[in-house]
């Protein structure tokens, strides 16, 4: 792996790394779409997915059947090379997603990209003793609210980005962040990015629409993308821009340092005075 270049790339998962919503994919592929649509207006999404996992279990669907469905989920062929290239260039990669741990880990392990991510922030998805998947909220809203009116009750991605930024600062890192997402839940974190960061919203998706309503609210440089090929190209361009900028700053520092040494050398060099001028 290349030397760390102080770039942190945060990926949403559904419709960003993969081409579909993993929750909908499992429900549809296992034949529970009608029940899902019936229950959708009655509860938050996270609670609904936990209920759907109970329904799957009650109807005899196993965890292995769920995993088999997840392993055939569609992904654009250029997304995996983009992830591998970014990692090889020294970027730190993280996932922030409103899916769940079992879905994400099953998919990225199957795709062979699990090792490239240093952190996955998502809703816990754990299998109980009866073999049923329990999907819990990332933030337990039954005990307290996370306080963000923009985000669903179980997860504020903006707070997660704030925590990541704070941890990087505590470690003394001056990292630049690149955030990629598609959904309305990715809007809140876009507002927390700094001027030196980059926001990559998927064009004509909810987060792109929200940003387009008032672009001045986002301090970061916004570069939209349409598909995996577009994502790879733009992501590599941004990484190269940041690395070139950092190399230029480093060269400027070295040049400034050399100039300083030369200047000091001239000032302190003994002056040879002709003897006939000595009084």
UniProtKB/Swiss-Prot annotation:
Keywords in alphabetical order: Hydrolase, Magnesium, Metal-binding
User: EC annotation?
Assistant: 3.6.1.1
Q: List the disulfide bonds.
A: none
Q: What's a BP term from Gene Ontology annotated to this protein? A: protein tetramerization
**Claim: Metal-binding is one of the keywords in the record:** yes
Residues where substrate binds? 23, 98
The active site annotation covers: 12, 14
> What Gene Ontology terms describe what this protein does at the molecular function level?
inorganic diphosphate phosphatase activity; metal ion binding; phosphocholine phosphatase activity; phosphoethanolamine phosphatase activity
Which parts of the sequence bind Mg(2+)?
Answer: 12, 14, 182
What does this protein need as cofactor?
Answer: Mg(2+)
**Reactions catalysed, as given in the entry:** diphosphate + H2O = 2 phosphate + H(+)
Q: What does this protein do?
A: Catalyzes the specific cleavage of pyrophosphate.
Family per record: Belongs to the HAD-like hydrolase superfamily.
**Subunit structure and binding partners:** Tetramer.
Q: What is this protein called?
A: Inorganic pyrophosphatase 2
This protein's species is Arabidopsis thaliana
């Amino acid at each position: 792996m290349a030397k760390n270049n102080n770039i942190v790339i945060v990926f949403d998962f559904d419709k960003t790394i993969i081409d579909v919503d993993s929750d909908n994919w499992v429900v549809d592929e296992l034949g529970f779409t009608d029940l899902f649509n019936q229950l959708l207006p009655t509860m938050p999404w996270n609670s609904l997915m936990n209920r759907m996992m109970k329904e799957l279990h009650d109807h005899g669907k196993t965890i292995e059947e769920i995993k088999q469905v997840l392993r055939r989920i569609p992904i654009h062929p250029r997304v995996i090379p983009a992830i591998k290239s970014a990692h090889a260039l020294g970027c730190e990669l993280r996932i922030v997603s409103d899916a769940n741990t079992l879905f994400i880990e099953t998919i990225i392990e199957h795709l062979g990209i699990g090792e490239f991510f240093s952190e996955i922030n998502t809703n816990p998805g754990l299998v109980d003793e009866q073999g049923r998947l329990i999907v819990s909220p990332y933030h337990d809203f039954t005990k307290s609210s996370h306080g963000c009116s923009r985000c669903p009750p179980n997860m504020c991605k903006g707070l997660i980005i704030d925590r990541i930024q704070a941890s990087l600062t505590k470690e003394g890192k001056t990292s630049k962040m690149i955030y990629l997402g598609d959904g309305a839940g990715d809007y809140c974190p876009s507002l927390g990015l700094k001027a030196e960061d980059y926001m990559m919203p998927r064009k004509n998706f909810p987060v792109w629409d929200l940003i387009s309503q008032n672009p001045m609210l986002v301090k970061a440089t916004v570069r939209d993308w349409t598909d995996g090929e577009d994502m790879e190209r733009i992501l590599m361009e941004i990484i190269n821009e940041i690395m070139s900028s950092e190399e230029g700053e480093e060269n400027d520092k070295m040049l400034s340092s050399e100039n300083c040494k030369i200047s000091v050398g001239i000032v302190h060099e003994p002056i040879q005075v002709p003897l006939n001028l000595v009084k």
